Amino acid sequence: MLQFVRAGARAWLRPTGSQGLSSLAEEAARATENPEQVASEGLPEPVLRKVELPVPTHRRPVQAWVESLRGFEQERVGLADLHPDVFATAPRLDILHQVAMWQKNFKRISYAKTKTRAEVRGGGRKPWPQKGTGRARHGSIRSPLWRGGGVAHGPRGPTSYYYMLPMKVRALGLKVALTVKLAQDDLHIMDSLELPTGDPQYLTELAHYRRWGDSVLLVDLTHEEMPQSIVEATSRLKTFNLIPAVGLNVHSMLKHQTLVLTLPTVAFLEDKLLWQDSRYRPLYPFSLPYSDFPRPLPHATQGPAATPYHC
């Protein structure tokens, strides 16, 4: 009985207009269940981008802030949902090492070359007779045993260190690099790379204000969609590099301290990287990195009965 009296007194003493934690939680739950009602009431929608590709049922999209480069104070303009299979994978450092070493060596060519005893000038005459002198027997002064002679088992360049990693390993390396950058708060998503001015000093001061570090890699969808202001600003800065989305690689992400992506770039990366998980195994070598469909037969005719692709 005493408990009921105390509960009634607390309810009577509560000021008008105040809400308990339970009621606030119920309102937040109703807002998440009915986002259309929240939008109809005039409240801004915080999520600017939704994941277009299907997400596994046991996982949820990862959220990141969407920022803007148009001002120092416009640091956060909304949220973006990121696919967990691209931006929240297991941090496989061994995969990062494999892909980084592959990028370092697959274009490496060593031009080191030494001459054998047949290529060294001279040495055609036997230095002394085989017997009778008491010296060790030799047949040429250009033997590898002699000073100035040829080299045995030396490098015979040019030597190529080319090898190819499986495409799915390379795609996994990009996923791991994006995941690590996001986990370390070194990945920033922008609504656009548009700057109010093309002065490089503005970009350096903005990066210093937001604590991006000394080196920044900015990625846009294509060269044609890059704003002229960001092109002018990065062209005069050595540590700020601007590349298209198709050129994003593990080496560049590890080399730069901060990675900046646009919303169209995020959609492009999710589409291309998740396609590697579900594509069929090719029976022919790829002609392009992202074209897996065979080309039409040269003798195929136009019409419904024509076979457009190889079987």
Swiss-Prot record:
Post-translational modification Omega-N-methylarginine, affected residues: 147
Alphabetical GO biological process terms: mitochondrial translation
InterPro entries membership: Ribosomal_uL4, Ribosomal_uL4-like, Ribosomal_uL4_dom_sf
Keyword entries, A-Z: Methylation, Mitochondrion, Ribonucleoprotein, Ribosomal protein
Residues covered by region (Disordered): 118-149
Keyword Ribonucleoprotein attributed: yes
Top-rank taxon, per record: Eukaryota
The keyword Mitochondrion belongs to this UniProt entry's keyword annotation: yes
A GO MF term: RNA binding
Main location group: mitochondrion
SUPFAM superfamilies for the chain: Ribosomal protein L4 (SSF52166)
Location of this chain's protein in the cell: Mitochondrion
GO CC terms: mitochondrial inner membrane; mitochondrial large ribosomal subunit; mitochondrion
Stretch forming the signal peptide: none
Subunit structure: Component of the mitochondrial large ribosomal subunit (mt-LSU). Mature mammalian 55S mitochondrial ribosomes consist of a small (28S) and a large (39S) subunit. The 28S small subunit contains a 12S ribosomal RNA (12S mt-rRNA) and 30 different proteins. The 39S large subunit contains a 16S rRNA (16S mt-rRNA), a copy of mitochondrial valine transfer RNA (mt-tRNA(Val)), which plays an integral structural role, and 52 different proteins. Interacts with MIEF1 upstream open reading frame protein.
Family of the protein in this entry: Belongs to the universal ribosomal protein uL4 family.
PANTHER family: 50S RIBOSOMAL PROTEIN L4, LARGE RIBOSOMAL SUBUNIT PROTEIN UL4M
Protein's UniProt name: Large ribosomal subunit protein uL4m
Species classification: Eukaryota, Metazoa, Chordata, Craniata, Vertebrata
Gene this chain is encoded by: MRPL4
